[in-house]
């Protein structure tokens, strides 16, 4: 080793030593910083720092252990990065020190000794021989070494095997003799771990033998030495009670087995395996044990030790198997690793002993325990994919092992594992083997684990079941998804299996149990068919006669067509079937494929575009499917084929026993097939099949059967009627009536519906000839006394369908004699109370009545009254509150359908009697309902009226003949029904009413003007406004409603004749007594008209009228009526404004809502708003607003007591400002109003509350008083002013953000006024002169508050004034106000604002202003002094040099003491003032000022990181300003660089980055000033501010760190003193300062 002498630096030695001492600091952040600093120095001076640290440890043996550990860790950190730079001598010292530290204490102290051990391991990478020698020295033969000597040996050899493995024999020669003497568990652990590391190192050495020094070594070179160690460890140490010892021992055993000779392994294998297995049963942490066992097994397989291992395999697998039965916790890496290690053990066994493994797994699969079977399946899945070659001859055995499970396993949990095994087996030929199709069938069955939710019956909601074993729980949806994916994966990614899938998959189309799998099966079939089709494969076509197991083409088609009617079921059932039909069309029938090729893609596109179940139209889709079926039969053009298709479909009826939706569709399709077939016997037999197979208790099946029979009846009506009558007769036992007879339950519903649908599709002439005798007569006795709802619905449906079949447009001359009798029957059905009826009965019954009304002749008036009275009672039906707004709920839809059916019934009556008399009669029925207290009844009745009026116009204009009426008789009475509803609370009611009025008036006009050539008469011009009124009447604005209703009255007066007006008025008067307050607006209109015409004459009655109207308002509940009353009051004010305002202002505060609305209605009038504002401002500014009274809390103090009139005027302004209508007028009076408000802010500041007496309702009780605070009322009005002028988001937001309004309630209210005027003046510079002129008279007001407000406003106006003449007046006003202390302070502050007027004006007034400000710069009042400083700062930024240069140095000297003042504001102001002097530093006073800059620079830099933000900002700005005077281009460039944070107002410099940069600037550009600078900064080490002490420490560190040795000499820096000072800060009380000091010391690595 070479020896290199290090030159010792006392400064660096002191630094490093101090840092080493500080590693014991109590603060963690400080310790962390010290560690980093030591690393920074050590990284650059590793030999020096490590030597000092080594010496420090050696010399200070008594330092506490924690401190020693920190030092050792620092050494290790440096060593890891600089190992190759160390001198040999230092390395030896470190080795010796590390050895000493590691072995000093005989007891094990892990934290301490482990670091020392790690040091040795790290050094060993460079000095392996020396480390090995040192360790062996401390491992004397025959004695136990220190614990960490042994641990270090293991770690050392493991980390660096190439140079160290040849030494293992020597180490083992010392280990083996003492191995048997070890008693302590911790020594057992360390020896076992070391031996394991040795074995692993040998394996690594042999693997890299090409680079090894001794190439003669083999894997078994050390087996003789390791063998006895293995025997001892295994026999003695595995029995210890210490878990860690057992685990590390068994892991070492596994490693050692890798390097034992075959003979040694053979002799020990049985004992080793038995021992490992026993541990597997005992230990909690199994990862080391399983890893060891895997190593042992790999060695056995590698060396082909079958004889020795065979008898152990069963115990091994028996022990391992339970471990693989536990589902691992994948969030726990250890659990996952253990699980994978166990699987790897089975994989190793399979590689060498596959027969035994397969036999074992076969037996385990028979176990009933779910976990056991799942574990076995996991093993099979693992080995199938990894041992394909080894298991080639075992595949039949594996298949036979899982086959029983595939066929009989009930558990979804196991099925999931089986599915995963099948997809694992698929690529390896298992499915092609005999019995492989069973696997495929299992997957299809898995896809079929599905129960469709849409089966026609509502399923009760089941509460979630508690899952006992969540890890064993698999849902059917999870299994389905797995199986779906597997079948898709097999089809699309394994082309070798195509021959297996095709055409075998067709076998799964027909069986009922595979129904839910059809989407995925057809998807696979489509994929294969298209593949074969694209290459013209020979086996594309299928001979269904030879393939006896496959379904026939007609069976496939029948199956597909039925399933097509539920296309949105799982996995896009409809699209999948259509795609498959298109792909296999040529296979099924050659004549249909062309049509399918055209039609099926369109149907697929339809389904792709209609995927939303909420908007899905089932009926439309079923029609499309039926049309496709019809076209398919037509293209096949073969009656025998059609019969075969019908037979196939009938054979499949039982497939849908549990699915009434599909069964319904099947019946309809069978009916269509029978319609297209001419074989009558076939038709008869299939009708019989339908009747015998239908579930009569299910409404869907009944309907499907009935519609199917209806389809059939289109071609075979008599056969169908004969069969129905047969069932009617043969299902009866008694002769008294059909429904009294016994028969299958529910068959009556099916028969009734069948009659109805047969009527629908039968030929009209044929049906009308049969209906009276052969249809109605047999069934009539049985439908008269129905009680149950389902039977009623079926009967109603039948009657409705029969009525539609007999409609005049079908059977024009037929008279249905039993029409009225059936209608009365329907009325009786609907009239019975629940449960014999429900809403559906009412809906269907009403619709059926509408159908019968259409039949000739017209119904009688008596029957009309019966049916209408009953149906209108349905208007009272309400939706429950829970569903009132839920338009998608069944209840809401049901009630809505009921109301619609009633409207249709009335319109049908009107259609058959399109006369004015009928229309009036129908509206007369609805009149009582239109006045109901229930809103929903009013709305429904008004909608019905509107509906009828529209229908009347439609029927009249579309009729072939002219209307019989020439006039609208009683139009006035009819209109009066609607007038109250024009102002109904309900928007829809109002809209319906107005539109009804418009259409009724149009009908009257139309009847008068209609001609045969001009049936639809163009509406009169008078009616046109009603269209816009109809749209506008929905407004909630009361005034608009009044205006619109007034317009309606004008239009009505123009449109109805004179003789109709009395009727109209008579009816309208009833509206005044309407239950709805909103409907009583007529009186208000009359009152308003009277005051408009006669108001001028009512001067004497103004107080009485105003009070009367206000009193009346108290009893008004209608908003519309209230607005009408207010309009009347405004009409009075148009004649007599001031008297009205005076009465309103006399009302007590706070104003009632009626008084407020009165002020606002007056203000809305453009002729009244201006005089109203002028009157209120005059009251506030020029009339007494308060009187002075003693303060209740201090009798010696006088405070203002406000007058109520002033408070009322203030509040009234605010109430007026709430109106958007007054915006323009308020803007016109802007400067007057803003001036009034700031004056009011002054007069109500610190004012006594205003006490308002409130009269008691009890005459004997004393009147109570409420207290109103004037300033709060003023603030409300102030804010409302800005909202009124639409400046809420600009001026108001800005004022609020400054908190200006909050200041108005404090003694500093003048500051709030200044801020408010600042914002106002910025946005409205044109108003400055107006505001000043308006406020100027109040400068000499008797009220001090007026004077303060005026001066405050004046100071701020200077900032925004551009008028030279006005500026002079403003300045003179301030100079004349330096009297009262507060006024003087405000005036002084305002004088400095002259700078806002520009350079010219500033210099014009500079002498006067500077003189005024300078006199108070030393004022004892700090506030006054600070304001003067700030004011001078502003002046100096603008004033000419000649006016300031003579006093420049004097000012600098006067303000420097303020830099360190405790007052934050003074500090900020003084720095700001100093910065403002920069403009004068380049002229005649440049040299003196340059010196002043450098004198103040240390303070500026320290305070740049002051605790107070305002001080920081002042220093930042000052540094930027002074940078141009620092006579350095580098400095100027730096401070003007935007990225450094000094340029922008919102930017902030990174302080530590700045200190680093500035220290470099200082050293380069001002080397002669560095010494002065650091000696000045060092004074801040004693600062009272912690932050400044830290700043100083950082700055000193940067300066010293950046000083080269030459510069240190040039600048005369005394580094010893400075570093001692920095080191001294390591003892500071503040952790922050200690941390900064440590950081700085870390920079001084070159001292």
Curated annotation (Swiss-Prot):
Q: What is this protein called?
A: Maestro heat-like repeat-containing protein family member 1
What is its biological role? Lysosome fission factor.
Q: Which Gene3D superfamilies match?
A: Leucine-rich Repeat Variant
Q: Which GO terms describe its biological process?
A: exocytosis
Q: Does the keyword Repeat apply?
A: yes
Instruction: Name the source's superkingdom.
Output: Eukaryota
Ranges occupied by HEAT repeats: 9-47, 65-103, 224-262, 351-389, 597-635, 968-1006, 1131-1168, 1364-1400, 1403-1441, 1490-1528, 1612-1647
Write down any Gene Ontology CC term.
lysosome
The alphabetical list of record keywords is: Lysosome, Membrane, Repeat
Task: Give the quaternary structure.
Answer: Homooligomer.
Q: Where in the cell is it found?
A: Lysosome membrane
Family recorded in the similarity comment: Belongs to the MROH1 family.
Q: Where are the transmembrane segments?
A: none
């Amino acid at each position: 080793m070479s020896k290199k002498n290090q030159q010792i630096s006392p400064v660096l030695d002191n630094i490093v030593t101090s840092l080493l001492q500080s590693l014991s600091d109590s603060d963690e952040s400080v310790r962390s910083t010290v560690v980093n600093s030591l690393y920074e120095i050590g990284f650059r001076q590793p030999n020096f720092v490590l030597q000092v640290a080594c010496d420090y440890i050696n010399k200070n043996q008594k330092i506490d252990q924690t401190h020693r550990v920190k030092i050792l860790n620092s050494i290790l950190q440096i060593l890891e990065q600089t190992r190759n730079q160390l001198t040999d001598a230092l390395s030896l010292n470190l080795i010796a020190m590390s050895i000493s530290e590691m072995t000093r204490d005989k007891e094990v102290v892990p934290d301490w000794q482990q670091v020392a051990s790690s040091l040795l391991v790290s050094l060993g990478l460079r000095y392996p021989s020396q480390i090995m020698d040192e360790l062996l020295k401390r491992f004397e033969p025959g004695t136990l070494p220190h614990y960490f000597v042994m641990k270090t040996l293991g770690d050392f050899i493991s980390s660096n095997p190439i140079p160290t493995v040849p030494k293992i024999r020597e180490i083992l020669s010392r280990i083996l003799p003492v191995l048997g003497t070890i008693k302590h568990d911790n020594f057992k652990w360390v020896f076992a771990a070391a031996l394991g590391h040795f074995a692993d190192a040998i394996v690594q050495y042999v693997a890299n033998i090409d680079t090894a020094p001794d190439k003669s070594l083999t894997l078994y070179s050390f087996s003789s030495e390791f063998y006895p160690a293995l025997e001892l460890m295994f026999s003695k140490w595995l029995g210890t009670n210490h878990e860690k010892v057992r685990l590390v021992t068994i892991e070492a055993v596994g490693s050692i087995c890798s390097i034992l000779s075959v003979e040694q392994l053979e002799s020990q294998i049985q004992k080793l395996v038995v021992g490992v297995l026993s541990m597997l049963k005992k230990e909690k942490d199994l990862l080391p044990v399983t890893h060891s066992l895997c190593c042992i097994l790999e060695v056995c397989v590698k060396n082909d030790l079958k004889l020795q291992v065979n008898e152990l395999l069963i115990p091994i697998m028996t022990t391992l198997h339970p471990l693989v039965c536990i589902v691992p916790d994948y969030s726990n890496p250890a659990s996952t690793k253990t699980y994978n290690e166990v699987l790897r053990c089975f994989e190793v066994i399979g590689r060498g002993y596959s027969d035994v493994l397969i036999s074992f797994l076969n037996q385990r699969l028979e176990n009933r325990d779910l976990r056991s079977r799942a574990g076995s399946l996991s093993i099979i899945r693992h080995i199938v994919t990894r041992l394909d070659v080894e298991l080639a001859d075992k595949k039949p055995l594996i298949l036979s092992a899982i086959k029983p499970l595939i066929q009989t396993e009930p558990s979804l949990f196991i099925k999931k594992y089986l599915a995963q095994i099948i997809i694992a087996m698929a690529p390896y030929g298992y499915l092609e083997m005999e019995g492989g199709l069973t696997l495929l069938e299992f997957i299809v069955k898995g896809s079929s684990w599905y129960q469709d939710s849409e089966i026609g019956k509502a399923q009760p909601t089941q509460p979630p079941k508690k899952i006992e074993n969540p890890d064993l729980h698999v849902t059917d949806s999870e299994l389905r998804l797995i199986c779906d994916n597997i079948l898709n994966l097999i089809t699309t990614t394994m082309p070798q299996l195509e021959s297996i899938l095709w055409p075998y998959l067709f076998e799964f189309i027909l069986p009922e149990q595979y129904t839910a799998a059809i989407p995925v099966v057809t998807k696979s079939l489509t994929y294969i068919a298209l593949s074969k089709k694209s290459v013209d494969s020979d086996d594309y076509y299928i001979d269904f006669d030879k393939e006896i197991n496959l379904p026939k083409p007609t069976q496939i088609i029948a199956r597909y067509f039925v399933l097509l009617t539920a296309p949105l079921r799982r996995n896009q059932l409809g699209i999948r079937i259509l795609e498959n039909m298109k792909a296999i069309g040529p296979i099924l029938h050659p004549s249909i494929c062309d049509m399918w090729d055209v039609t099926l893609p369109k149907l697929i596109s339809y389904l792709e575009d209609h995927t939303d179940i909420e908007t899905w139209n089932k009926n439309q889709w079923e029609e499309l499917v039926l049309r496709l079926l019809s076209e398919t039969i037509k293209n096949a053009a073969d009656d025998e084929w059609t019969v075969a298709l019908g037979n196939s479909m009938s054979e499949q009826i039982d497939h849908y026993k549990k699915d009434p939706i599909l069964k319904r569709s099947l019946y309809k399709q069978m009916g269509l097939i029978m319609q297209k077939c001419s074989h009558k016997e076939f038709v008869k037999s299939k009708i019989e099949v339908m009747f015998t197979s239908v579930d009569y208790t299910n409404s869907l099946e009944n309907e499907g059967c009935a519609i199917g029979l209806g389809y059939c009846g289109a071609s075979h009506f008599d056969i169908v009627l004969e069969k129905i009558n047969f069932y009617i007769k043969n299902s009866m036992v008694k002769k008294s009536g059909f429904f009294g007879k016994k028969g299958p339950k529910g068959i009556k519903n099916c028969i009734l519906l069948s009659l109805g649908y047969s009527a629908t599709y039968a030929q009209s002439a044929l049906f009308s000839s049969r209906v009276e005798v052969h249809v109605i007569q047999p069934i009539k006795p049985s439908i008269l006394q129905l009680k149950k709802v389902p039977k009623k619905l079926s009967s109603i449906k039948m009657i409705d369908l029969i009525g539609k079949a007999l409609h005049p447009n079908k059977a024009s001359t037929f008279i249905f004699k039993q029409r009225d009798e059936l209608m009365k029957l329907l009325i009786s059905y609907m009239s019975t109370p629940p449960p014999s009826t429900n809403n559906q009965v009412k809906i269907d019954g009403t619709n059926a009545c509408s159908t019968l009304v259409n039949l000739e002749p017209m119904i009688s008036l008596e029957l009309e009254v019966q049916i209408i009275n009953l149906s209108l009672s349905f208007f009272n039906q309400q939706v429950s509150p829970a569903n009132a707004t839920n338009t998608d709920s069944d209840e809401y839809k049901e009630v809505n359908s009921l109301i619609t059916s009633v409207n249709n019934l009335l319109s049908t009556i009107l259609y058959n009697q399109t006369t004015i008399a009928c229309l009036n009669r129908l509206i007369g029925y609805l009149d009582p309902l239109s006045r109901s207290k229930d809103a929903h009844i009013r709305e429904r009745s008004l909608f019905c009226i509107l509906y009828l009026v529209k229908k009347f116009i439609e029927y009249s204009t579309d009729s072939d003949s002219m209307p019989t009426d020439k006039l609208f008789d009683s139009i006035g009475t009819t209109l009066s029904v609607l007038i109250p509803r024009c102002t109904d609370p309900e928007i829809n009611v109002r809209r319906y009413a107005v539109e009804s009025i418009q259409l009724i008036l149009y009908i009257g006009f139309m009847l008068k003007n209609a001609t045969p050539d001009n049936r639809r008469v163009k509406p009169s011009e008078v009616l046109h406004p009603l269209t816009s009124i109809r749209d506008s009447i929905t407004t909630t604005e009361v005034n608009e409603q009044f205006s619109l209703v007034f317009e309606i009255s004008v239009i009505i007066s123009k449109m109805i004749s004179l003789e109709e007006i009395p009727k109209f008025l008579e009816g309208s008067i009833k509206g005044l007594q309407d239950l709805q307050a909103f409907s009583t607006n007529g009186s208000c209109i009359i009152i308003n008209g009277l005051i408009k015409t006669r108001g001028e004459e009512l001067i004497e009655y103004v107080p009485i009228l105003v009070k009367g109207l206000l009193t009346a308002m108290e009893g008004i509940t209608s908003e519309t009526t209230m607005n009408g009353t207010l309009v009347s009051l405004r009409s009075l004010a148009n004649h007599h404004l001031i008297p009205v305002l005076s009465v309103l202002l006399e009302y007590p505060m706070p104003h009632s809502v009626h008084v407020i609305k009165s002020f606002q209605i007056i203000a809305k009038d453009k002729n009244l708003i201006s005089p109203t504002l002028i009157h209120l401002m005059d009251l506030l500014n020029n009339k007494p607003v308060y009187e002075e009274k003693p303060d209740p809390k201090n009798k010696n103090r006088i405070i203002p007591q406000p007058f109520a009139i002033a408070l009322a005027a203030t509040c009234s302004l605010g109430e007026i400002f709430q109106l958007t209508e007054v915006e323009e007028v308020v803007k016109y009076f802007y400067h007057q109003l803003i001036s009034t408000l700031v004056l009011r802010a002054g007069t109500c500041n610190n004012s006594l509350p205003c006490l308002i007496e409130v009269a008691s309702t009890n005459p004997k009780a004393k009147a109570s008083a409420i207290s109103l605070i004037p300033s709060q009322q003023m603030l409300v009005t102030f804010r409302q002013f800005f909202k009124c002028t639409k400046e809420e988001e600009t001026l108001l937001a800005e004022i609020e953000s400054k908190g200006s309004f909050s200041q108005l309630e404090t003694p500093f209210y003048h500051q709030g006024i200044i801020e408010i005027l600042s914002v106002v003046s910025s946005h409205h510079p044109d108003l400055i002169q107006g505001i000043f002129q308006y406020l100027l008279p109040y400068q000499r007001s008797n009220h001090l508050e007026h004077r303060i407000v005026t001066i405050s406003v004046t100071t701020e106006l200077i900032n925004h004034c551009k008028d030279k003449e006005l500026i002079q007046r403003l300045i003179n006003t301030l100079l004349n106000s330096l009297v009262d202390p507060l006024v003087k302070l405000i005036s002084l502050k305002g004088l400095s604002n002259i700078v806002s007027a520009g350079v010219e004006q500033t210099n014009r007034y500079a002498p006067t202003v500077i003189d005024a400000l300078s006199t108070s710069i030393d004022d004892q009042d700090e506030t006054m002094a600070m304001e003067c400083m700030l004011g001078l700062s502003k002046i100096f930024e603008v004033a000419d040099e000649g006016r300031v240069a003579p006093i420049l140095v004097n000012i600098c000297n006067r303000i420097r003491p303020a830099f360190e003042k405790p007052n934050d504001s003074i500090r900020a102001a003084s720095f700001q003032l100093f910065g403002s002097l920069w403009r004068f530093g380049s002229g005649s006073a440049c040299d003196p000022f340059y010196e002043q800059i450098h004198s103040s620079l240390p303070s500026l830099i320290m305070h740049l990181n002051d605790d107070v933000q305002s001080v920081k900002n002042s220093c930042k700005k000052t540094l930027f300003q002074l940078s141009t005077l620092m006579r350095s281009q580098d400095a100027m460039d730096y401070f003007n660089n935007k990225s450094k944070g000094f340029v922008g107002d919102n930017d902030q410099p990174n302080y530590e980055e700045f200190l680093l940069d500035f220290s470099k600037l200082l050293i380069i550009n001002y080397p002669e000033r560095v010494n002065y600078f650091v000696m000045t900064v060092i004074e801040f080490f004693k600062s009272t501010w912690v932050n400044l002490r830290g700043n100083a420490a950082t700055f000193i560190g940067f300066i010293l760190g950046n000083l080269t040795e030459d510069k240190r000499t040039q600048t005369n820096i005394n580094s010893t003193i400075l570093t001692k000072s920095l080191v001294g800060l390591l003892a500071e009380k503040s952790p922050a300062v200690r941390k900064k000091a440590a950081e700085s010391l870390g920079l001084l690595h070159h001292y």
